[in-house]
Curated annotation (Swiss-Prot):
Official protein name in the record: Globin CTT-VIIB-6
Species for this entry: Chironomus thummi thummi
Annotated signal sequence range: 1-16
Positions of heme b binding: H76, H111
GO CC annotations, alphabetized: extracellular region; hemoglobin complex
Note: There are at least 12 different components in Midge globin.
Complex formation: Homodimer.
Top-rank taxon: Eukaryota
GO molecular function: heme binding; metal ion binding; oxygen binding; oxygen carrier activity
Pfam families, A to Z: Globin
Upper lineage: Eukaryota, Metazoa, Ecdysozoa, Arthropoda, Hexapoda
Amino acid sequence: MKFFAVLALCIVGAIASPLTADEASLVQSSWKAVSHNEVEILAAVFAAYPDIQNKFSQFAGKDLASIKDTGAFATHATRIVSFLSEVIALSGNDSNAAAVNSLVSKLGDDHKARGVSAAQFGEFRTALVAYLQANVSWGDNVAAAWNKALDNTFAIVVPRL
């Protein structure tokens, strides 16, 4: 998985302050509403932060409009969204905490090897949240659940970078 498995970033931690079942349900239901838009999610991230696009050798330096409809772009977007979907599906159940920790730790390790910074994870987070806000029913409760999930994820990922 590439830098964008970073999306996992987006996902649900299980460490310091695990998501409650209600918080996990909010994250899961809002994610379900957009998770079929893999290409649009990745395109939104790249449009907001071209430095992230440039971390991918197959997309670096290319016009987003020229790559967005390619098979390579769709394949990569699907990998990222699938990773996020896996982590999100595991959230809200204490018995899955070790699995979430393992997945998110590997994400951090893999992205350290690619030279991805904590700041770039922050950019990804910002772009993902903006995409969610524009495309799902977004209230204070959903925002709080996603912020907690992402904070938990960062608590695992950032020390590994």
